[in-house]
């Protein structure tokens, strides 16, 4: 059975720029105005990444637009947001991203079936230029294949 996910934002560039080796789910600490803005779908995680600060993991560069109906207590749009993970998961992540070349990238943000905001993270390794070219060639070849099959 597939799990219910109402996707708020996706990072499609991450799949092109990185090799995703492992995926994991994390909760995120938000303010009330941020949740209301997310319900309207006003978020972007294109350039966002996560990093550790000792025993905690934070999401950086995630843009959540200000909620128009909030008064003066609105939130900062690009503030660092704490990710909610178990201690074992944090230690595992820190061990993996301390290796040279690995980073923690936000892949998607969504509401789960209990209406909690979750972030899907990926432990990723950056692609070189030649790898990106190969993935473009593969994508074009698959598109051409599907055209040929449809024509027959």
UniProtKB/Swiss-Prot annotation:
Gene3D superfamilies in the cross-refs: 2.40.280.10
Keywords: Cytoplasm, RNA-binding
Pfam families recorded: SmpB
Signal peptide bounds: none
CDD domains from the UniProt entry: SmpB
InterPro entries documented for this protein: SmpB, SsrA-bd_prot, SsrA-bd_prot_CS
GO molecular function list: RNA binding
Covalent S-S links between cysteines: none
Cellular compartments per GO CC: cytosol
GO biological process, one term: trans-translation
Superkingdom, natural source: Bacteria
PROSITE patterns given in the database record: SSRP (PS01317)
Subcellular location: Cytoplasm
Function description: Required for rescue of stalled ribosomes mediated by trans-translation. Binds to transfer-messenger RNA (tmRNA), required for stable association of tmRNA with ribosomes. tmRNA and SmpB together mimic tRNA shape, replacing the anticodon stem-loop with SmpB. tmRNA is encoded by the ssrA gene; the 2 termini fold to resemble tRNA(Ala) and it encodes a 'tag peptide', a short internal open reading frame. During trans-translation Ala-aminoacylated tmRNA acts like a tRNA, entering the A-site of stalled ribosomes, displacing the stalled mRNA.
UniProt cross-references to HAMAP family, sorted A to Z: SmpB
UniProt similarity note: Belongs to the SmpB family.
Protein name: SsrA-binding protein
Taxonomic source organism: Rickettsia montanensis
